[in-house]
Amino acid sequence: MDYYSTQISKLIEELGRLPGIGAKSAQRLAFHIINMPKEQVEHLAKTMLDARSNVKYCKVCQTLTDKEICPICSSEKRDQKVIMVVENTRDLAAYEKTGKFDGVYHVLHGAISPMLGIGPQDIKLKELMLRLQGDVDEVIIATNSSLEGEATAMYISKLIKPAGIKVSRIASGVPVGGDLEYIDEVTLLRALDGRIQL
């Protein structure tokens, strides 16, 4: 038996499609939104639509930004010769929180996963290889320590080594299967400082 009106059920269903939002969370969010003042709901909806319309990939590193080139890539204070490769923008943000990495990033927007049908052509590897034609000294591979992250790291390493560019992998300390965005800054720093050459 459906206890909610059609509109409430639709809202719960749509919110439940978001990653990390289960049925109970979707229900809580739906009722919170329904009880918000109309102006706040309109502002929330407009903010979401604006973000969807205006956020794009940085032309250099592929992170999400509202500019053609993100602030990190356009900063003269960053070492453009050292590129850290991460799976997503959340991982980039996790390293930025440490305040210790002064290089630049490349965001893959995924990891190789044959089980899910995700191959090298489905992530931003082509863009990375184009960047490496420039003046690059080191590529630090900071993919997650999951099977997919490890497979992606090995694939990237094999692609880059023939170019004579130093390739390193962040050290463990990041638990196997752990997502970087949930790791504290100290652990991330230790992983970065203890990286190994591949």
Swiss-Prot record:
One of its GO terms (molecular function) is zinc ion binding. GO terms for biological process: DNA recombination; DNA repair. It holds the Pfam family RecR_ZnF. Keywords: DNA damage, DNA recombination, DNA repair, Metal-binding, Zinc, Zinc-finger. The keyword Secreted does not apply. A zinc finger (C4-type) spans 58-73. CDD domains: TOPRIM_recR. Residues 81-175 form the Toprim domain. It comes from the Bacteria. Belongs to the RecR family. May play a role in DNA repair. It seems to be involved in an RecBC-independent recombinational process of DNA repair. It may act with RecF and RecO. NCBIfam families: recR. This is Recombination protein RecR. The gene is recR.
